Design a protein with these regions (language model features):
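Gly/Ser-rich catalytic/binding loops embedded in alpha/beta enzyme cores
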Residues: 2-158
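Glycine-rich beta-alpha junction loops
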Residues: 63-65, 160, 212, 220
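Residues forming well-ordered secondary-structure scaffolds
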Residues: 85-89, 139, 169, 208-211, ...
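Structural signature of FAD isoalloxazine-binding scaffolds in flavoprotein oxidoreductases
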Residues: 163-168
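Ligand-binding "clamshell"
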Residues: 169-175
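A short helix-breaking turn/cap at a secondary-structure junction
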Residues: 175-234
């Protein structure tokens, strides 16, 4: 059965409403704007316009990335009122491919732990067992995916922050080669920075299948002028 972007988004929003109170994975919602974007996506689909590979796909983003118009904290109480005016570069690539960002998912303070607690939003629980952790630092991302609250997620990883939550929640996560996906707009460093600040961290997708990982990587991977030593072959 063919479904509209609006119907797909509404189904995920209903799932968030149903299961998120006990899991606490999705910590910020932008439902109204997302619904408007879904309606626009449906109109574009009906007009037979050229569509991106993620056209009309609703998704959430780890709260370590800046997302335009949605509170973006990095799990840091000092940044709890930060509402970016731009997207992180990796987020923008998803948006340019047609994705509709409808929320943010929980992280530990500055993405610096293998669990997902911070003083702003509290603790994220593993949807398979609410007494256990989904891991970290992309624990909110993995928990939201495993609980059917989102079909795709963008995470980040230094020492297991994508891989551990994917393992704990029975998902697929990929830590790509260093700097083939831009981390400009990742927190840390502080909001609004034009550099990544951390030479070890990489951005990467989490999904429920390897095929979905491949689709996401095709969108996310790109050389950036300021932030792509991996692409500069001499």
């Amino acid at each position: 059965k063919e479904v509209s972007a609006q119907e797909v988004l509404e189904s995920f929003l209903k799932q968030v409403e149903a299961v998120n109170p006990s899991i606490n994975a999705v910590v910020a919602l932008d439902a109204e704007r997302a619904l408007e974007k879904a309606k626009e996506a449906d109109k574009k689909m009906a007009s037979k316009s050229k569509l991106g590979s993620l056209h009309g796909l609703p998704m959430t983003i780890k709260d370590a990335f800046e997302v335009e118009g949605i509170v973006s904290t990095g799990g840091n109480p000092a940044w709890q009122n930060n509402i970016p005016k731009r997207n992180a570069e990796a987020v923008q690539r998803l948006v340019d491919a047609g994705a509709i960002i409808f929320g943010k998912t929980n992280v530990p303070f500055l993405s610096s732990d293998l669990q997902s607690f911070n003083k702003i939003y509290g603790t994220t629980n593993n949807p398979w067992d609410l007494e256990r952790t989904p891991g970290g630092s992309s624990g909110g991302s993995a928990a939201a995916l495993a609980a059917g609250m989102t079909p795709l997620e963008l995470g980040s990883d230094v020492g297991g922050s994508i891989r551990v939550p994917a393992h704990f929640c029975g998902l697929f996560g990929h830590k790509p080669s260093y700097n083939i996906i831009s981390e400009v707009g990742h927190m840390p460093p502080p909001p609004g920075s034009i550099s990544t600040g951390n030479g070890l961290s990489v951005a990467g997708p989490l999904a429920r299948s390897p095929e979905d990982l491949e689709i996401a990587l095709d969108v996310l991977v790109a050389a950036q002028e300021q932030d792509s030593p991996a692409w500069k072959i001499k």
